[in-house]
UniProtKB/Swiss-Prot annotation:
Keyword Nucleotidyltransferase: yes
Organism (species): Cyanidioschyzon merolae (strain NIES-3377 / 10D) (Unicellular red alga)
Gene: rpoZ
Role: May be involved in RNA polymerase activity.
EC number per UniProt: 2.7.7.6
Disulphide bridges, residue numbers: none
Residue ranges of the TM segments: none
A Gene Ontology term for the protein's cellular component: mitochondrion
Keywords: Chloroplast, DNA-directed RNA polymerase, Nucleotidyltransferase, Plastid, Transcription, Transferase
Listed name of the protein: Putative DNA-directed RNA polymerase subunit omega
GO terms assigned for molecular function: DNA-directed RNA polymerase activity
Amino acid sequence: MKLLNQMELLLSTCKNRYVLTREVAEYAKKTPSPNAVILAIWLMARKTK
């Protein structure tokens, strides 16, 4: 549950939220590991700031 909250926080602080969400969705389809998806979200959020 805590990880979901972190993801929400990252998405809400991201300026280009819709692009980020689409990228994450594409990545999540390819990657079975939730941790890898969360890492990707974090990296993308850092990249867009």
